[in-house]
Each structure stands twice: as structure tokens, then as C-alpha cells.
Amino acid sequence: MASQVSQMPSSSPLSSNKDEMRPKADFQPSIWGDLFLNCPDKNIDAETEKRHQQLKEEVRKMIVAPMANSTQKLAFIDSVQRLGVSYHFTKEIEDELENIYHNNNDAENDLYTTSLRFRLLREHGFNVSCDVFNKFKDEQGNFKSSVTSDVRGLLELYQASYLRVHGEDILDEAISFTTNHLSLAVASLDYPLSEEVSHALKQSIRRGLPRVEARHYLSVYQDIESHNKVLLEFAKIDFNMVQLLHRKELSEISRWWKDLDFQRKLPYARDRVVEGYFWISGVYFEPQYSLGRKMLTKVIAMASIVDDTYDSYATYEELIPYTKAIERWDIKCIDELPEYMKPSYKALLDVYEEMEQLVAKHGRQYRVEYAKNAMIRLAQSYLVEARWTLQNYKPSFEEFKANALPTCGYAMLAITSFVGMGDIVTPETFKWAANDPKIIQASTIICRFMDDVAEHKFKHRREDDCSAIECYMEEYGVTAQEAYDVFNKHVESAWKDVNKEFLKPTEMPTEVLNRSLNLARVMDVLYREGDGYTYVGKAAKGGITSLLIEPVAL
């Protein structure tokens, strides 16, 4: 989350004789203004709620009803998931897939069915073997030329390949094979298959944000001739109901943010509370996580302010007491801070105090201590980076990586995301998370390395900041593009680790693991074409507009 800088004008309210030459990050103001300050003056009417409930029960019956073959069952479950309503039917879908896993009819398994079955089962943790794809290869070990004409089968194989783990060479080959042939075929396809293929080549199902993907698929699914009218109507109503809830949450958060008045008090910092909410709604969008969403959005907003304080304004001498104050976590420390640091320090403590009050009624105060400790570790790693910048120190790549991974904040966000969850989260969950398990490591690597490539490639970094890409280039004598390729390989490897951690038996319930999966997905969506959070790229603008502004036409 580093930035380009310019010199802060001496007329700035924060400048003084001592520090009038401080750098100031040249961030654009929020593009949303006060748009989300007020919630739309409407509620879901009783008739719509009744219809929603009626359709929900009809869809539930369809999921568990016998169908002519497993292909139909798999396709229906896939539609339920891709339309964003599977959270209503978790047990029913799990039971149906368990049955399919144990009762495979090989006669049905063309490329489409084999790939769809593989993807859905892997998504739900069933360790189905990638050997099921061997029958689509010839004696030379290449994919048969006959499958290239099966575009729908190729599309499903492409999507399935993103569930691969380490050692699954056939799926590594499948990514290249399907990408090549789908790219060649897309121009000659008819709608809506052409749209499915072109969208998939930009964003796979596995790495896309479920609600963003659901919004897109709603517009495609209704044009598929064989679509299920009951499911489509239910998904549209459900989308709008959840959107209204999200707008109410964002309105509440926007008022909190406006009251803090950081735009005036801390002009060096990013004003990205809307983008922060979009980020966190990617971590969990479902209605039952409303409390968690609001708490975690406030945390990411404050983490962004703290990051900018370390990275874009404060002197190293000021950061020492600031870090100590965060470590001590005591409002009495505020008197030891420079005047401009006091508002952010107080606001940080207030966010966690509110968090404690909200979870106290369920006896979950212990969770907030883990969240505080995660924030403290984040601040400590920021201080290390600040010291390196002050000393113009060039660490080795491994030394840089050891400190840079914590500074991306993903371990902190993962741990804090558990605070607002239900009884599925226990003290053991936090002990597990605090020990840096593989899935949190993997999502952190995805975050850090995608951020590093984006910052360097799109020149979103201060010249005096330590750059992971430049550390690597200098140490190994490679070009920038060669360094990008190495970092991208680390990202691909981390995705395989994420996938592996979902295969049963798992260390933690899927509901817990999903938080790290979704954090990784946010990076894939927001950072593939630059820092989409700081510089609010096309993905962020489009996602916020489609999820929070425009309802689905019924």
C-alpha cells in the first residue's frame, strides 16, 4: 500500500518549521463523495419477503429431488452456487455432493461432466483424483484433438484446473491448453456462451469474488435457454435483499467515517472507506456476517490510516512513540504523541473498544485480544520498514520478505475476520490462526507479491521506499519482467496451497478457511491490473457500482 509522493506545501495545517519538507502521498480524493452517506429510503415489502421464502423452499426441493442423471444434478448445483444463493442450502448441497462423490457413473463422464464434477467436489473439499482427466489424453500424453471442438467441455476443464494442487501436472497443462483453444474459439461463438468464455478468460470462478461473479452470471444465466425460472427469480430477489442490507451497513460506516473528519485532520491519508467496505464484503457477503462486516471494515479503514501514517507522513522519530503507544494499547499514551497522531490513535482504540462491547453479550471478548495483538504486530512490521527507509538500507530478498509478508496486513485481517463470526469459531481457531497456518501464509503471499508487482509495474511506489522487486532484481541480477515472473510463480504456488488446505480432512471448518480464500480472491480481483484500492481501478469501480448502487431488474 505504498505510494508516490510529492512535497507537502508549507501552508499545510500539519506542517511546521521542523517538518515542512515532509513527503505527502498524492492520493486522489474519494470518487464517491457522500453518495453512500444516506441509505435508500426503502425496505423489502412483505409480499416480496413472502415470495422470497416461497421460492427458497422450491429451490431447496429441487436440490434434493432425484434427477435423470448426475450431470443435471451437478449443473443445477453449479447454477445455485454461481448465482450467489448457495449459502441458503449449505447442508443440502453438501449431502448431494457427498452422494455424487461415492456414486460415480463413468458412463456419464464426458469432458463437461467430468470437469464439472471435479470442480464442484474439489470446491467442497472432496479429494477427487485428477487422474479422471487421463482418458482425454492420447498415447503421446497430449490432450486429444477431438476435445478442442467441445467448447463447453473445454470451458469446464479450464475452470476445474484452477482447483489444482501441487504435483497435478495434467491440470497445469490443462490451463495452457484450454486457455489457448478458448481464446481461439471465442470470436466464433454465439451469445451467451461467448460471454461465458470471454469472462472466464478474464476471471476464473475459483479466484473471483462470489458476489461479483453472481452479479455477472445473473445477466448471463437469464439468457441461457435452459435456465430454471424459479431459481432465477429467487436469485434476483435475494441479490436485491442483500444489496439493501449492504447499503444500510455502508451508510452506517460512512457516517462514522465522516464524523472522524480524517479528510481534514489527516490530509496525507487515503479516503477509501467505500473501497474498504467492498474489500470486506468480499471476505464475507452473507447476511449472517453483518456484524463482522461492519467491524472488519472499520478495522481495515484504520489499518489504512495507520499504514499511511508510517509510510507517507510521519518521521521515524515520531513513529517510535506511535508504535510504543499501539503496543501498550492505553489511551493514556496519547499525551506522548504529536498532535496530528492523536485522532488516529484514539479512533483505533475506539474501534476495538466498540468491538469488545458488541461481542461481550456472547462472552466472546477473548477474541478481541487476538485481534489487538494482530494489529500490534502489523504496526511493529511497519516500523521496521520505516527504519530501512530512514537508513537507506537494502535488505536481502529473504530478509525483506520476512518483514514484508506481515506488512500486507492479511494475517491481521484473517484473525480479525473471525471476531464477528458465530459459534463455529472457538479459542482453538484463534490459537491456530496465531501460529501462521499454511492457508494464512498462502493468502498473505498472494497479497504481498501481487501488491509488489502492481506497485512496481504501475509505478505506485515512492522512490525512497524499499521495493521487493528491486531487492530481487539487485540480488539476482535479473530484469523487472523476470522478477515479475518469479513473483507470479510464487502466487500460483500459493494458490495451490490454498486449494490443498480445503481438501478433507481439514484443520478447521470450511467456514473458517473461506475467510483466507476470499481474502486471496480480493487480491486477484483488485490488484491484477495495478493497486485497485489506492488508485480505484476499473475492477473496484465496476464492483462497487454493480453490488452497491444498481439493483437487479426483476
Curated annotation (Swiss-Prot):
GO biological process, one term: diterpenoid biosynthetic process
InterPro entries named among the record's database cross-references: Isoprenoid_synthase_dom_sf, Terpene_cyclase_plant_C1, Terpene_synth_N, Terpene_synth_N_sf, Terpene_synthase-like, Terpene_synthase_metal-bd, Terpenoid_cyclase/PrenylTrfase
Residues reported in the UniProt entry to bind Mg(2+) 2: D307, D311
Pathway annotation from the record: Secondary metabolite biosynthesis; terpenoid biosynthesis
Enzyme Commission number(s) from the entry: 4.2.3.13
Low complexity compositional bias, start-end: 1-16
Enzyme's top EC category: lyase
Requisite cofactors: Mg(2+)
SUPFAM superfamilies per UniProt: Terpenoid cyclases/Protein prenyltransferases (SSF48239), Terpenoid synthases (SSF48576)
One Pfam family it belongs to: Terpene_synth_C
UniProt GO MF annotations: (+)-delta-cadinene synthase activity; magnesium ion binding
Catalytic activity of the protein: (2E,6E)-farnesyl diphosphate = (1S,8aR)-delta-cadinene + diphosphate
Motif (DDXXD motif): 307-311
Keyword Lyase: yes
Alphabetical UniProt keywords: Lyase, Magnesium, Metal-binding
Binding positions (Mg(2+) 1): D307, D311
Residues at which Mg(2+) 3 binds: D451
Cofactor note: Binds 3 Mg(2+) ions per subunit.
Similarity section: Belongs to the terpene synthase family.
Function: Responsible for the cyclization of trans,trans-farnesyl diphosphate (FPP) to (+)-delta cadinene.
Comment block on domains: The Asp-Asp-Xaa-Xaa-Asp/Glu (DDXXD/E) motif is important for the catalytic activity, presumably through binding to Mg(2+).
Name used for this protein in its record: (+)-delta-cadinene synthase isozyme XC14
